[in-house]
């Protein structure tokens, strides 16, 4: 299997996000890397499902609550940016203050 650097990055995000999902399901709070990976993964999957950039930016503020992350994480995550593939091409999606 030959993967580009971008594909390797996305695979790493997916791996970390699956770990984050398991931890959330067990009632554990996410740390900074897990929270960012989880948010990025949901953007990638939303784009794959055909959602627009605007929809993802709006929904992205509802995916994680402060009580689902470790203390201090919301203050560290002011924005998450990820390039996602949409039906009309690759676009940058930015989530502003996504953990509320």
Curated annotation (Swiss-Prot):
One GO term of the biological process aspect: urea catabolic process
SUPFAM superfamilies for the chain: Urease, gamma-subunit (SSF54111)
Subcellular locations according to the entry: Cytoplasm
Known pathway: Nitrogen metabolism; urea degradation; CO(2) and NH(3) from urea (urease route): step 1/1
Principal location: cytoplasm
Protein keywords: Cytoplasm, Hydrolase
InterPro entries: Urease_gamma (IPR012010), Urease_gamma/gamma-beta_su (IPR002026), Urease_gamma_sf (IPR036463), Urease_subunit (IPR050069)
EC code: 3.5.1.5
Catalytic reactions of this protein: urea + 2 H2O + H(+) = hydrogencarbonate + 2 NH4(+)
GO molecular function per UniProt: nickel cation binding; urease activity
Top EC class of this enzyme: hydrolase
Lineage: superkingdom: Bacteria
Key word Membrane present: no
GO cellular component terms listed in the entry, alphabetical order: cytoplasm
Subunit structure: Heterotrimer of UreA (gamma), UreB (beta) and UreC (alpha) subunits. Three heterotrimers associate to form the active enzyme.
Family classification: Belongs to the urease gamma subunit family.
Name of the featured protein: Urease subunit gamma
Organism of this sequence: Parasynechococcus marenigrum (strain WH8102)
Taxon lineage: Bacteria, Bacillati, Cyanobacteriota, Cyanophyceae, Synechococcales
């Amino acid at each position: 299997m030959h993967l580009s650097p971008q594909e390797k990055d996305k695979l790493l995000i997916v791996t970390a996000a699956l770990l984050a999902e398991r931890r959330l399901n067990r009632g554990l709070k996410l740390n900074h890397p897990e929270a960012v990976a989880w948010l990025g993964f949901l953007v990638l999957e939303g784009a794959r499902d055909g959602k627009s950039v605007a929809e993802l930016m709006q929904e992205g503020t509802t995916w994680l609550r402060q009580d689902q992350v470790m203390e201090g994480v919301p203050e560290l995550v002011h924005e998450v940016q990820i390039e996602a593939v949409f039906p009309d091409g690759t676009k940058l999606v930015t989530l502003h203050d996504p953990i509320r």
